[in-house]
Amino acid sequence: MYQVSPQLSPRQALPTMYDLPSEEIGDPGLPDEFHLLQPELLRDTFRPPSYPEDEVFTASDLNLYYDLRQSQWYKRPDWFAVLGPLRRYDQQNLRLSYVVWQEGVNPFIAIELLSPGTEKEDLGQTLREINQPPNKWTVYEQILRIPYYFVFDRYTDTFHAFGLTMNRYQPLTLEGQGIWIEEIQLGLGLWQGSFQNRERLWLRWYDRDGNWLLTPAESEKQRADLEKQRADQVLLALSQEQQRTEEAEAEVARLKPLLQQSGINLD
C-alpha cells in the first residue's frame, strides 16, 4: 500500500522568490554613485498620504520577475513602488526578489535612471531577438501594465514621464515642479539641492501644496532646529527678565539714599 502525495494547488506549485535567483553571476553592478543615491532619496520622500505604511513597498535594483510563462525572466528597475495589500513576511524574512505571481500586486510606478549602457533598453529602442526577453519598456507597458513610468538622464538633466493610456505609454506634460499623480496625491519633480553632501538636480516627491517632502534626516534636523529655537527663546526671556530685575534693583539702590534723606526708611 503506498501513500499518494497530496496535490498542490496551481498557486502553491508556482516558483517563489526562494526558487528563483536573486542575483546573477556576471551581471554588472551599479554604473555610478548616482544610481545608489537617487533611489535612496526617492524612497525616503515617497509617502502617499492615502496609503498606510504596510501597503507601500519600494525597491531599487531588485529582481522583478514578471512572466510566469518564462519564470526565469526578470527586470531590475532602478526604482519601483507597489501600492495595495501586500504579501506579509515576518520581520526576519526579507524579500529576495519581487515575484508578481507570488505577490499578487503589480508595481504602480517604475523609474529608470539612464546610463549609456541602458538607455536604449529603458526607452524601448532595442529590437527583441527570438527567444530573448523583451526590453524594459515592453515589460512595463504591455506585460505588467505599470500605470506610470519615469525616465531621468542625469547627464542632460532630462526628465521624461509616461502614463498608461489604452495599454500604451503616452508622454505626460510636465507642469510646474513636475508631474502630479492624483491617485497617490503626490508629485514627482526636479529638485535642486544637496543630498548626502552632493549638490545637483535630483528627482524628488512633493505634496499637493508644492512642498518637497522631507527625508527622515531632514525631518529630524527640522525638529532639532525647532527645539533649539524654542530653547533659545526661553533663555532670551529669562535673560530679559533677569535684566529687568537687575535694573529694578539698581533703581532701588539709587533711590534709597534720596528717600532716606526725606525721612523714608525702606528697611
What feature does the model see in each segment?
Residues 58-61, 148-150:
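A short glycine-rich, hydrophobically flanked beta-strand micro-motif that places a catalytic Asp/Glu
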Residues 32-60, 67-80:
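Acidic-basic catalytic patches of nuclease active cores, encompassing PD-(D/E)XK
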Residues 84:
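Divalent-cation
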Residues 2-31, 45-48, 66-71, 87-145, ...:
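C-terminal interaction segment
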